């Protein structure tokens, strides 16, 4: 599971600087690190579901 997560993080970091994605306008350039991290955020909710179920003993 950790390998999949690290692979996704690595891929999002590599492809975020790719020519396939557009650059942010200069006015929003300070938000660039947040925008690079945003594709990974849904995975945290997915992992949170497993942590929550483990906390309640998978009822």
Curated annotation (Swiss-Prot):
Membrane topology per record: Single-pass membrane protein
InterPro entries: PSII_PsbK, PSII_PsbK_sf
Subcellular location: Plastid, Chloroplast thylakoid membrane
One Gene Ontology term, aspect cellular component: photosystem II reaction center
Keyword set, alphabetical order: Chloroplast, Membrane, Photosynthesis, Photosystem II, Plastid, Reaction center, Thylakoid, Transmembrane, Transmembrane helix
Pfam families registered for this protein in UniProt: PsbK (PF02533)
Propeptide: 1-22
Biological process according to GO: photosynthesis
Transmembrane segments: 30-50
Function: One of the components of the core complex of photosystem II (PSII). PSII is a light-driven water:plastoquinone oxidoreductase that uses light energy to abstract electrons from H(2)O, generating O(2) and a proton gradient subsequently used for ATP formation. It consists of a core antenna complex that captures photons, and an electron transfer chain that converts photonic excitation into a charge separation. May be involved in PSII dimerization.
HAMAP family linked to this entry: PSII_PsbK
Family statement: Belongs to the PsbK family.
Subunit structure: PSII is composed of 1 copy each of membrane proteins PsbA, PsbB, PsbC, PsbD, PsbE, PsbF, PsbH, PsbI, PsbJ, PsbK, PsbL, PsbM, PsbT, PsbX, PsbY, PsbZ, Psb30/Ycf12, at least 3 peripheral proteins of the oxygen-evolving complex and a large number of cofactors. It forms dimeric complexes. This protein, PsbL and plastoquinone-9 are found in PSII dimers but not seen in PSII monomers.
Protein's UniProt name: Photosystem II reaction center protein K
Source taxonomy: Eukaryota, Viridiplantae, Streptophyta, Embryophyta, Tracheophyta
Name of the gene: psbK
